[in-house]
Amino acid sequence: MYLNKHDYDLIVAGGGLAGLIVASSAAYYSNQTLRILVIDRNPLPILGRKTITGWICGDAVGKKSVDYMTERIGLKWGYPEIEHPVKGVIAYSPNHEAAISFDGEGYLLNRKMLPQKQLQDALKLGVEIRGNIALRSVLAENDTVVGVAGQDLITNEAFKKTSRLVIDATGVTSVLRTNLPIKSFIQTKIDRLDLEATGRYIYNFDKASEDKTYFDSRYCIIHLDQKIAPGGYAWVFPKGENKVNIGLGVQQKALDRHNANRGIRQDVKALIDNYVRSNPVISNPTIACEEMDDGNGWGTWQVSVRRQNDCLVANGFMMVGDSGWMPKPLDAGGIGPAIIAATIAGKDAVEAIEATDTTEKGLWKYNINYINEYGYKTAGLEVFRRMLQTLTNEDIDYGMKHFLSKMDIDSITNGQHPEFSSLDMMSMIIRGSFNRHLAESLRYTANMNKKLVEHYHDYPSDPQDFEKWHKVLLDYLAQAYSRFQ
C-alpha cells in the first residue's frame, strides 16, 4: 500500500532541539538532495515548546558538544541563543564544605530563542517544516515503519505522510515509541524509577550578598542535598550577573519517602520555592518576562535518568534525544547527548537511505556509532546515580570530602575507572575514621562501571547477536539494582 511510493525520503517527528539538528545533519550529508520534512505540534513561532508553560530545561550545555556539531555539520550558534558562557560546573556537598568542579567550559542557552535560529538554519538547508500537526502514530507495513499519522490542529483534518525513514524526536513521552506497532528490540516503555520530576524558574534578581557556593556568574552550581532535592539534585545556573535558571529534580519514590518521614505533602514546586528562599544571594526574584523569556519563566517536566534505549533503531525507524532516553543519568543533562546523537543520526540516516536499506540491519550502525561516541558510559552513570540515591547527607559530605576527587568525577563522567583516592582511604583507616560501607559502595560502583563500559564496547555489530548481548547487560544491571535498592 505504501512501500512503492513515498511523500518524503525522511520525516523527522518533533521540531525541538534534537529534531532540527538531525534534519539539518541529514540535509548537510546528503548535499540537500533528500526530501526532508520536520513535523511539530507547535506553530512555527513557538517551535519546539514542550508544554504550555514553555521550553522547560536547565539550559546548560558543554562547549565540547556544541563544537562537535559545528565541526561536523557547520551549524554555529551565537547570541541570543547562547545567552551566557560558563567556565564549568561545581558540585557542592550538603554542608558546602566540599566542592568538585567538572565538565569544563559551557553555555547557558535560551531555549525559546534557539529553535528560531535552528529553524532558519534548517530552512536554508532545504528542509521543509510543518507546524500545528499532532502526530498520533507511525504508519506500518510488512513490519516496517513507512510514515506518520496524526491531526492537523488548524483544520482538524487527518494528517498522513509516508517516507523511507522516520526519526522520532518527540520527547520522553513519545507516543510513536510507546505504541510502536512493529517487532523490534526497542524498549517502548520506561520504568518510573528511571524518571525524575524537575522544575525551574528563570529569575531576574538583586544580589543580597556574595557567596560563591550559592551563586557564581562564572559557574553552574549543583547542590547535592537529600533534604533539598530527595533522590536528585538542585541547581543554580547563571544566565548573567543578575539572572538565573534555578531549580531541582527529584526521584518520586525518594520524594514520597521524604514527605512521609516529615508528615507533609510537598510537590516539586514547593521544594523549589523553599530552595529559592533559602539562597542568601538571591533577593527580590522576579520571573523573567522580557521578549526572549516571555512565556518561559516557570515550568515542570519529567526527565529520564537511565542509559539510552538499549536499541535505537527498527525497520524504517530511529530515535534521537529524549525519545531515546539520552539525558545523562547522573545529572539529567540532555542537550549535549541530543546534539551528538542527532549529528550522528543524520549522517547514518543518509547513508542508509542512499543505500536503499533502511531496515533494522541497515540502520544498526547508528547504535554502534552513538555508543562509541557517548553511549558507552551511560549504564555506568546509571549505576552511580542509583548508588547516590541511597546515601544520606552525612554520607555525601563524607564521600565528597574524603573519596571523590576531581580526577574521580572526571573518570566517572568519561566512563573510565576511578580509583576513589586510595591514599586518602589508607590515611583514614590509620586514623580510625574510615566509612567502610561508603567505601565499599564506591568500589563496587567503580568495578561495575568498568564491566559495563567494556560490555558496551562489545555491542553487537549485527542485530542477530543483540539478545545475547542484552541478556548480559540486564544481568549486570540487576546485580547493581539489588545492591542499591
Spans of model-derived segments:
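N-terminal Rossmann-like FAD-binding beta1-loop-alpha1 element of flavoenzymes
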Residues: 3-38
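Predominantly flavin-linked oxidoreductase catalytic cores and closely associated redox partners
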Residues: 15, 25-28, 121-283, 325
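N-terminal FAD cofactor-binding segment of flavoenzymes
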Residues: 25, 29, 41-89
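Short beta-strand to alpha-helix junction loop
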Residues: 57-64, 101-121, 201, 256-267
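A conserved beta-strand/loop capping segment in the N-terminal third of enzymes
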Residues: 67-117
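FAD/FMN-dependent oxidoreductases across multiple families
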Residues: 135, 228-234, 250-256, 260-345, ...
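Active-site-proximal substrate-binding core of FAD-dependent oxidoreductases
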Residues: 325, 347-398
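C-terminal auxiliary extensions adjacent to catalytic cores
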Residues: 387-485
